[in-house]
Amino acid sequence: MITKREDIRNIAIIAHVDHGKTTLVDELLKQSGTFRENQEVAERVMDSNDIERERGITILSKNTAITYKDTKINIIDTTGHADFGGEVERVLKMVNGVVLVVDAFEGVMPQTKFVLQKALELNLSVIVCINKIDRPEARPNEVIDEILELFIDLDANEDQLDCPFIFASAKSGYAIADLNDERKDMQPLFDCIVNNIPAPEGDPDADTQMLISTIDYNEFVGRIGVGKIENGKLKVNQEVTIVNHHDPSVRKRVRITKLYTFSGLNKVDVPEASFGDIVAVSGIADIHIGDTLCSVENPVAIPFQKISEPTLSMDFMVNDSPLAGKEGKFVTSRHIRDRLFRELNTDVSLRVEENPGSENSFKVSGRGELHLSVLIENMRREGYEFAVSKAEVLYHTDERGKKLEPIELAYVDVPEEFSGSVIQKLSQRKGELLGMTPINGGYTRLQFSIPSRGLIGYRGEFMTDTKGNGIINTSFEGYEEYKGDISYRKTGSLIAYEDGEAVTYGLFNAQDRGTLFIGPGEKVYAGMIIGENPRTEDIEVNVCKTKHLTNTRSSSADEALRLVPPKILSLEQALDYIDTDELLEVTPTHLRIRKKILDSTLRYRANKK
């Protein structure tokens, strides 16, 4: 018989990047008594991954649970970046409602639309939390109108349109149901969750069913599958059948060795859990996202949410430069292959395939440049050494044979004086200006529809054009007819002439030709790119050249050579910079840009063809 678990609420916190989801979860954890009063807690405690803490973004969805009065609230903190949208899509299957967090100043942004659309498609209950209302430039009433317009644009039904609004400052630790209410604590949000999010439903006596929505890993117990029990119960030592989501005919009987529920930031061992509980199971070696744990007697799979397809790809390959193998721990094609295919176990948005005709190269497809750059950064930190190519978009073909390309919706916030330059640059990259709105602080918000390939390599140029004051946010919109050719980099490269070590004298002579990426003492090799030429052509320079010494000295002492500090490129900047005939060499200690063909004579012949 179908019953409700009134003692449980399962919710996801969804939002655009940097609208304050993780800070909000921090405050809910603190005010629910999850931490001791004297316990020191890091800011954004849910962002446990090093890259997440450095960049201030959530990449992987996290599970936590709090108890408010007599109700256990399971909370999933999701990512707000479009490149990790696959994380959002699958974890929403575990919950009955969402808290949509929207910045009281920025309002509705591209990812707000994406995450809300996914929640409405699954018919989830929505609570709108307008966060950061303590900002001086906050405009909560206007943001309410923007959100209601978005609901209407997404064809929300009457029940969904009638969702409650909460106003909050997660940083200051309060939430209010009305802007005139006293600002004390988060209790209004707790009450709103308990009163408006439906309790999970299921049949406690039915056959066991649990969809695996995320995979965790622990070196002591191995792979850990996380999901919500839809029906029945799970017990330690229970024998269950795993039904593979790719092929439901593939089934395997396994035994549950450990069963956990969530409490605060910890997993808690439990002997048994019932429908509605979000749990973690271990002891199953080859469990994958999308698989269903079922009773042995009646194995019925739960349909898995289709994940949006990748839009960009890069080639990952063995590093074959003259400096190959000197800095990395894992350098062979087998190492790289195993690591890439292992990533597929936890990242459902990623695709990996071996490039035909080359056993040392792999085509890796993802949802955007950030998606792939985070994978590259993780591999670097783990000791891998490899090379990657420039990102390319993935084209589709319609039924008439027309070429289709991925299109992004871009929201660009820039100081008014730079808006003309940004409009010109994005228009050259086949962007179509959809709207232009003045916002507070002398900024203008530009809304563009632009091909994904038009944004490849643009962010560095954008930061230069806006003197670091611009913000660009994008979200995948769909596929449209090919918009025509785009000319990318307008500059050439300064290329090292020979193998050796860069010296001050050689760099001093080279710096007049353009902007250098390296300083003295760095190892270089022929074909390595050591700087940028402001003109379109590539120039070979000898940065290893030392000054010719004579046994006579000039009457005045040699003037000290002054070098301009080099421009050190970050991983994202380097990926933005490389052209189609170039590669980025990635090692745990260095990023080097190089030509695909290192030999200048062979390169010249290839360019003439």
Where are these regions (language model features)?
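P-loop NTPase switch module centered on the Walker A-proximal segment
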Residues: 1-102, 106, 146, 215-218
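Short glycine/threonine-rich beta-strand-turn micro-motifs
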Residues: 169, 356-371
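Conserved nucleotide-binding/hydrolysis modules and their immediate coupling elements
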Residues: 209-314, 324-326, 337, 491, ...
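Long insertion/accessory domains within large nucleic-acid-processing enzymes
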Residues: 262, 267-270, 404, 450, ...
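A short, contiguous, amphipathic alpha-helix enriched in charged residues
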Residues: 321-344, 560, 564
